[in-house]
């Protein structure tokens, strides 16, 4: 029985490339495994007006930019219903700081101050901000520098030219941050906001200004924190459960299918490496439901091998030539494996499009696992079987422990 060199090369690449990806880009762990913070935000209707259809999309985009400023890896930000947003931040160091940053409306306004606590109408707002950053004043204290877009720069120059000697109040969410006296016209669209800032608070405000103001008021409805130690315990328990399941499955395959069972165990190892490698490549976040999806797909991979081996045994018992039995067994097993996996994929599609959070994570991992299990069962297992048959000169009796067959 000949086996093409190209297929052996493919087998090697299927193992080596995912292994490199796993080593260089470890799998992202979700909130329940790594620890972190989950926040539920709700957009508030103003003056009885219903939210516009695209309002939550704008809120999500702005919250995404704010979270990016925190440096959190792989945040999960998704809509829930018509007016809610779920934000999951795994591994965040300061939960309260993150919550404050996410939930702040950050409505920036420039107003001419007319008295101690009175202001004129808004002459410029945060929509004109092009960039914001932290810089130091003459005393080395942090303040926020900002740059305006072209339209904002022209308007800012006009405001400062026509209001010399007056105070220009810089307001954030209705609170005065600073109110410098306009000494001269300010061209170029650059300015600064000073105040009693620490470096961290200045950086947060700069991030808020860069991300932009939320189009509606947001209320924090729920916050939930998961301690990192709980995530570590979950990982430990899950690893133990997965190892026990893997050992039991491996022993079962060895006991029932002998050498072919060992081949199936090797194929399962390839399945695990390839699945993890794909998760790293596409940046999938692994959660506890995702692990459940992986273990379920592992079981489906075992089922596929069982179907294949039973078909091969049927071919052998019919007295066909052994080399033909292997090819025919794989070919006849393929329709049953395909049908079973397609029905599972249809279910995962429903879960992904109509589910939220953990349910979608489960669906994504299960989908990856099902696709990989089909590939490993039909292609990888066949290559390994033929390699074993060629090297060890196996027949039906040696491969499956069948008596009285060649």
From Swiss-Prot:
Gene Ontology, cellular component aspect: plasma membrane
Q: Keywords on this record?
A: Cell inner membrane, Cell membrane, Membrane, Protein transport, Translocation, Transmembrane, Transmembrane helix, Transport
Residues that span the membrane, as ranges: 8-28, 240-260, 262-282, 289-309, 334-354, 361-381
Which NCBIfam families has this protein been placed in?
Answer: 2A0604s01, secD
Query: GO MF terms on file?
Result: protein-transporting ATPase activity
Q: Record's InterPro entries? A: Acrflvin-R, SecD, SecD/SecF_arch_bac, SecD/SecF_CS, SecD_1st, SecD_SecF_C, SecD_SecF_C_bact, SecDF_P1_head
PANTHER family registered for this protein in UniProt? PROTEIN TRANSLOCASE SUBUNIT SECD, PROTEIN-EXPORT MEMBRANE PROTEIN SEC
Record function comment:
Part of the Sec protein translocase complex. Interacts with the SecYEG preprotein conducting channel. SecDF uses the proton motive force (PMF) to complete protein translocation after the ATP-dependent function of SecA.
Summary of subunit composition and partner proteins: Forms a complex with SecF. Part of the essential Sec protein translocation apparatus which comprises SecA, SecYEG and auxiliary proteins SecDF. Other proteins may also be involved.
Q: Which protein are we looking at?
A: Protein translocase subunit SecD
Report the sequence similarity comment from the record.
Belongs to the SecD/SecF family. SecD subfamily.
Q: Which domain of life is it from?
A: Bacteria
GO terms under biological process: intracellular protein transmembrane transport; protein targeting; protein transport by the Sec complex
Give its localization: Cell inner membrane
* Bilayer disposition of the protein: Multi-pass membrane protein
């Amino acid at each position: 029985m000949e086996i093409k060199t190209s297929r052996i090369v493919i087998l090697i690449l299927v193992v080596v490339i995912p292994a490199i990806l796993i080593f260089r880009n470890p799998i992202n762990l979700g909130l329940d495994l790594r620890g972190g913070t989950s926040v539920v935000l709700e957009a508030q209707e103003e003056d009885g007006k219903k939210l516009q259809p695209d309002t939550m999309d704008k809120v999500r985009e702005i919250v995404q930019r704010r979270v990016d400023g925190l440096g959190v890896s792989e945040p999960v930000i998704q809509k829930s219903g018509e007016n809610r947003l779920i934000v999951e931040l795994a591994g965040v160091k300061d939960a309260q700081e993150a919550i404050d940053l996410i939930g702040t409306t950050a409505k920036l306004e420039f107003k001419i101050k007319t008295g101690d606590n009175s202001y004129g109408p808004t002459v410029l707002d945060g929509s004109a901000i092009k960039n914001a950053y932290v810089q130091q004043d003459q005393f080395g204290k942090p303040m926020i520098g900002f740059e305006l877009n072209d339209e904002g720069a022209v308007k800012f120059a006009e405001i400062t030219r026509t209001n010399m000697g007056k105070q220009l109040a810089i307001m954030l969410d209705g609170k005065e941050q600073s109110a410098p006296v306009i000494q001269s016209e300010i061209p170029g669209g650059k300015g600064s906001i000073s105040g009693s800032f620490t470096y961290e608070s200045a950086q947060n405000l700069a991030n808020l200004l860069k991300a932009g103001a939320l189009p509606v008021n947001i209320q924090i409805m729920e916050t939930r924190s998961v301690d990192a130690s709980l995530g570590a315990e979950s990982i430990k328990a899950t690893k133990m459960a997965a190892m026990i399941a893997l050992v039991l499955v491996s022993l079962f395959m060895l006991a029932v299918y002998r050498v072919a069972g060992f081949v199936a165990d090797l194929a399962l190892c390839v399945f695990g490496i390839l699945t993890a490698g794909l998760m790293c490549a596409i940046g999938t976040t692994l959660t506890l439901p995702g692990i459940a999806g992986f273990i379920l797909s592992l079981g489906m991979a075992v089922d596929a091998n069982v179907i294949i081996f039973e078909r091969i045994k049927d071919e052998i018992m019919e007295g066909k030539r052994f080399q033909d039995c292997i090819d025919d067994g794989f070919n006849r097993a393929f329709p049953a494996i395909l049908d079973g996996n397609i029905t599972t994929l249809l279910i995962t599609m429903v879960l992904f499009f109509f589910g939220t959070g953990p349910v979608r994570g489960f669906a994504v991992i299960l989908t990856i696992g099902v696709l990989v299990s089909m590939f490993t069962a039909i292609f990888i297992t066949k290559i390994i079987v033929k390699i074993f048959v060629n090297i060890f000169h196996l027949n039906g009796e040696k491969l499956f422990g069948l008596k009285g067959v060649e």
